[in-house]
Amino acid sequence: MDVRGYVDLVAQGRIMEALQVIRSDNPFPSICAYVCTHPCEDACRRSQVDKPVAIRALKRFAVEFGGDRMIQAEAETTHHEKIAIVGSGPAGMACAYYLRKLGYPVTIFEAHSELGGMLRAGIPQYRLPHQVVDTEVKRLTQMGVEIRTNTRVVSLDLLFDLGYKAIFITIGAHQSLRMGIEGEESPGVIDGATFLREVNLGLKPSLGERVAVVGGGNVAIDVARTAARLGAHKVNILYRRSRAEMPANPEEVEQALEEGVEILFLVTPTRIKRENGRLSITCIRMELSEPDDSGRRRPVPIKDSEFNNEFDTLIAAVGQAPQTPGDFRLRIGKGSTIQIDPVTLITNRAGVFAGGDAVTGPATVAEALANGRLAASRIDDYLQHRYPQVSKEGRQKLVGDLLPETIEMIRKIGRLEPPILPPEARAKDFETVELVYDWEAAVNEARRCLRCGMGAEILFQDKCASCLTCLRLCPYHAPYLDASGTIQIPPEQCQACGICVAECPAKAIVLRKPHDRRLVTEELEHILKSAAESKLTPFIVGFCCQYGLFGTGTLASLWREAKAGIWIVPVLCAARVETEHILRAFEMGAEGVFIAGCGEQCARDNTASSVCQRVEKVRKTLVQIGLEPERLQAFFVDTTGENPAEELDKFVEQIGGLYLASLVIQEVKN
C-alpha cells in the first residue's frame, strides 16, 4: 500500500487520485477506513517529532468523499475453471475480488442471509455500519461474482461434483472459547460472539441492569459498549492483566471508559453461581509475573484475595476459534485452526485451500484481506500448474530514524484528530462514533506527512562539482561529505524541501517520487505554449504550491476564472521553483511572474525565506536585462485568510499598468 502516495495526494486536494491509489492495493478501503487497527501509524516517523499522521482517518476521508463515484466494472471471464469460496468474511471477499480480476468464474457460499462474515456479525454498527459492508459487497456483484447466501456447505465432495476445480475455505473463527470455570453453563452466562451476532441481526437480548464482561481484547470492548447501548446501567469488564497488557485498541478502550464502562484490572472470575435470579460471581485478584508465550506478563492469583460480585448477565469474551465441519476432512492443528502448506496454502486435500481466521485464528481485517489476495494468487498458480514464486527480495528497505538534531529543526504541528460524537450522545444508540474530516482538516492533517524517502538524491554524481551549495543551504543539515570527498544525502534526514534541487548549479540533484523537476519544466512549457496561442493580456505566470489553500483548488480556480491571462503552474513546494523556470517564463513573453506559497500553515519554517532570497536574486537579473524588478512577486497565503487573492489583485493591476505603459512606449517608438 502506497501510504505516502495517497496521503500526499490528499495534502494536495487531489482526492479522487488518492482514492485510486488506495484502491489499487486495497479492494475494500471503505471497510479498512472504519476498522483498521492502523499499524502503519505505529511505524510513522512523524511520531518521532510529535504524533503520527492520522493515516486511517485520511483514508476514511478519501473514501467518503469519492467512494460513490467509483463504479466497479464487470471483469471479463478468461478462464473456465470454476472456483468456490466457502465463507464471506474479509479473506473470502478479497479472494473473490482478485480471482475475478484474474478472469475466473467465482461463487461465494455463505451460510447466513448476508455477506460479510465477522464484518457484519461481529463488529458493532457504531464502528462499522452495515451499509459500508453493503457498498463493498455491491462491488463484487458488479464484477460478476456469484453469491449464494443462506447456503451452508456440508460437503466439499459435493462442490467438486458440481464442477468446481478449487475451493477456498474461509469460515472464520466464530466459536467462543470457554472460561473453564465452575458454573459457566448457568442461565445468564452467554458468549461474546453470539451476543454480538444477535445484536447485529437486529435482536435485543435481555441483559438486566448489571453486566459483567470477561476479557481484554477488542471483542470484550465491543461487547461492553454494546451492552451499555442496550440499556445496562452498570457494565464492568473483568480483565486479569493491567491496562498496559490489554490487547484491545487503546482508542476503543478510552472511548469505552468515556461512555461509562468500568474496567476492573488484575481480576478474574473463578466461580459462577445462580442465586435468586442473579449471578453471584466469585473473583480473585491477580498480580503479574514473568512474560508468557504471548510476550505479556503472566497473571498469577493472589492468595486469599477472593471477593464476590452480583450481576444479571455475564458475557464471556476470552477468545474465539474456528469450527470446521468434520465432513470437510481437513487436518486440524493448534487452536482448532486448519493446517495448510505455508507456501501453497493448500490443505491436506488436493484443490482445497484455506485462509483467514480459520487458519490464523482471530486476526485483523487488514491481515485477512492480505491473506485473501495471496490465496487468489496461489489458486491461480494451482489451476495453471505453476509452483508459486516466492519473492526473495523481502520487504522494502525501511528509512532509518531521524537524528535528534533533525527532529529539533522540524516544525511541530499538532495532530488533527477526526471528530467524534460526545460520550453522552453516542451511548444512546448505534450511530457511527467517529465522524469524518472536513476538507480543510484533511488537507492540513495530510500536510503533516514528512514524505519519508521522497527527498533529494544526487542522481548525477559525474555532474556534482562539490561546490557545497547544498551543504550551505540545507536547513536540515542533511548533505555531508564522506571520506572520499563525495556529497551524500541520507534519505532518513532529508525532509524533501527541494531547496538543494532548485539551487544546485550543476543540476545534479533530483527529488525522488512523487516530484521530478522535469515534470515542472514540461508543465511550464505546455502552459507557455497555451498562453501564446490564447493571446490573453496581460500574460502572467503563477507558480502555485499544491498544498494548503492551493491544494483545495479554490484559489487556483478562482484566479483562472477571474483573471484572464493568468496561467498557473502547479509545484509541490514554492521553494522548488527554480531560477531557470522564472526566467523561462519571462523569456517567452510573460509580463509578470509570481510564486504563491503557504503562509503560517506551511509545514516547513524555511520555505518563505528561501523563496524570498531566490526572488531577490532573480530581480537583480531582471534589472540587468532591462525589466522592472516588481514584475516578479512572491505571495504567502493561508486557508484562514479573509481575502487571499487581495495581494494578487494588486499585482495584476500593477502588471497591467506596466503592460499598458510598454504599449505606449512601443507606439511612440513606432
Model regions and ranges:
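Flanking helices and flexible, charged tails adjoining ferredoxin-like Fe-S electron-transfer domains
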Residues: V53, K59-K82, P105, R120, ...
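A conserved FAD-binding loop/helix module that cradles the flavin
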Residues: A358-H385
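Glycine-rich dinucleotide-binding loop and its adjacent helix/turn
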Residues: F61-E76, T135-N150, S176-L230, I332-A350
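Glycine/serine-rich phosphate-binding loop and adjoining beta1-alpha1 elements at the start
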Residues: R4-A75, R139-T141, L158-E198, V433-V443, ...
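Feature captures the FAD/FMN-dependent oxidoreductase FAD-binding
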Residues: T77, K82-V86, D134-I181, R271-T282, ...
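Beta1-alpha1 glycine-rich phosphate/pyrophosphate-binding loop at the start
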Residues: D2-Q12, L19-I22, P52-R56, E81, ...
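Iron-sulfur cluster-binding cysteine motifs and their immediate structural context
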Residues: M1-Q12, A33-A62, T107, A111-E114, ...
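FAD-site-proximal beta/loop scaffold in flavoenzymes
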Residues: P187-E209, D292-P362
